[in-house]
Amino acid sequence: SNLSEESDMSKKIIFITGVTSGVGRETARRFIKEGWKVIGTGRRQSRLDELAAELGGDFLPLCFDVAKRDVVVEMFANLPEGFKDIDVLLNNAGSSIGQNPAQSGNMDDWDEMIATNINGLLYCTRCVLPGMIERGTGHIVNIGSVAGNRAFKCGNVYGATKLS
């Protein structure tokens, strides 16, 4: 009915990266419970499918890697009607691979960690900001880690990405 469509259009929208586990998953559950629409991203389609079955029609699962700039730009450009006007961006996706001593660490792992933890956050933020500025409203929340402030063994690169 027309009334439910209007009601549906008035729901606030949160975009959560890294929604398939931990903080991202629990945040999605909470926002759905509070009556929001949730766009959730992850790299594992099977986990997104499980979450979609649980959360229902107000959850839009998107399977992609936030570290891939062209893919991020394309995904944001092609959001379906009813999910375009994002009220909150939760940059939650993160990688912690490659936690080795600096002298013997795998530089490919470090590149992947930097691409996800820093570049992915920047790509998503850049895609969301124009709409928020145009509407004069919006919030961006970046999930950090105590690892950005406290050193831990073999956490050199991870700590740097979480402090950025």
Regions found by a protein language model. Name each.
Residues T20-S21:
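Conserved glycine-rich cofactor-binding loop
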Residues W36-E50:
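Conserved glycine-rich Rossmann-like NAD(P)H-binding loop of the short-chain dehydrogenase/reductase
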Residues T125, T161:
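Active-site helix of classical SDR
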